[in-house]
Structures are given as C-alpha cells and as structure tokens.
C-alpha cells in the first residue's frame, strides 16, 4: 500500500495524467471521424459499437517519459521496437493487417528488444525459445483483451509490480496512461477499448522488464508476474487443440469470456477478479522471492493452475473438449 501511495504521489505521474487525459479526450473526438470503431460480432463480449485504439497512449506515454526523464540514448532499441509494434498494431485497429505482416513486425521488434539486452550473445536454442515465448505473450495479451477493464486493471497491477522492483520513471508514464484509460474503459458501457495497439504494447513493455529482471537475477521465475494471463491463455490453447480448432483464429473460449458471456458476470467484476488474483499472487511472490525461497512461489503457482482447472471443469464441463458445431 505504501508503495502504491508513493507511486501515485510521485510528481512526474501528475504530468503523465495531464498528458494522458488530454490525448484521450482528443482521441475520443477524432476516432469516430475516421471510423476507428469496434463493431460487435459473434466473438465479441460487447453489444455496442465502441471506439478502439485508445491504447495508443500506452506506448506514447512510455516513450515520452523515456525521452523526457531517461538518460540520453537509453532504451533506443526498445523504443524502436515499441514504435514499430505500435504503428502496425494501431493500423490493424483502423484496417485489418494480415497476420503474416503482424508476425513479421513482432519478430523485428523482439529482435530489437534482444539487441537492447544483448540476448544475441546467448545460445541459439535459448534465443529461439525466449523469442517464441515473447511473441506468444504478445499474442496472448491481445486475445486476453476482450472485456471492459481487463487490460487496464491487469496492466496497472503488472506495471506497479514492476515498479516495485525497479523504480524506472518510464513506468510512471505507463501507469499514468493506464489510470487515464481506466477512467473511460472501466465501466459497464466503456467509452473506448485499448485495441490491438494497447494490448500488444503492454505485452512488449512487460516482456522487456521481465526478461531484464531474469537476466540480472539469473532466475526466470519473474515470468510468473504474468501468471494469471499465462494460465488462462496456455490452458485455453490446450483445450482448443483438443477440440481441433485453429488456435490462430479469433475466438471467445477464454475463461474470462465464459464468465462474462455465458455466466453473465459483469465485465468489471471479472476484470477485478483477474487483476486482484494477480496482485495477491505478486504479493506472495515478492515476500518469498526476497527471502530467497522459490519453492513457495512455485507451490502458489501450481495452486493457481489447480484452482483454475477445477473451476473450468466444474462450470464448463464437457463443453471444454467437445468440438463446437457451426
């Protein structure tokens, strides 16, 4: 709690709020003129046309804080990768971009991230593995961004957690952007969605910090700061493979979508559950990590997996493995 209060009382974050709200108010007026609207379809969890792409403020505020408050020349490769992903993803929010082009942009961006952290010096097999993991994270975040508030709350929890480890002022810009976005998105009828640009940018920024922490500590356990999203994304893929579905196609098979759509639990409530679960896990993570006790963290993660599976099997039953008829 003290960390949260200290973070929110940090002077640069006030500047971030002003810029973020100004950008969002402007975007909400301009976006409809260019038809940057998310229109509901059979996969959607919303029923009203809504402005999308508002997550453009995430990479903008993050990059702005790096340039204004960071060291000269700092994070050049990271910002280049973030800019590339931001441009391609935002264009995808405006007009559909072919999957191959999006994947190509992701590969280049990950390559730039690797350059930032000198990953190219690693063994080839490890470079490939980590690259696949980061691209998987980027696409998982995109699929997980399907109901009001979920990206904003989960992103806020993750950004605060990362800031607890490393007081990087650029994260304050991201936190300010997330809070401003939540003002318009965390409601029954959202004023805007983050869009691909928001989800992809968050995943890329978080991947940088988690990989950085893993390198510095020589411990990959930091990836569990994304445990809740990781569990839902990975297990949903497994069930989709069992049902012989194309896992690259859009869908609404995630557990959060089931809760919001089939169980009719309010979007905001589901988003708070996901964010709170990750926040509580992170508290345990930090408590045991800084006591140099890794086993309890892994036990807690295993417990999350078991609870998640138990809930899905209990609530969804055989539909988890039955092929869906069209």
Map each language-model feature to its residues.
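C-terminal membrane-associated helical module and adjoining short loops/tails
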Residues: 1-5, 9, 215-326
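"…together with the soluble PPM/PP2C metallo-phosphatase catalytic core" -> "…together
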Residues: 2-234
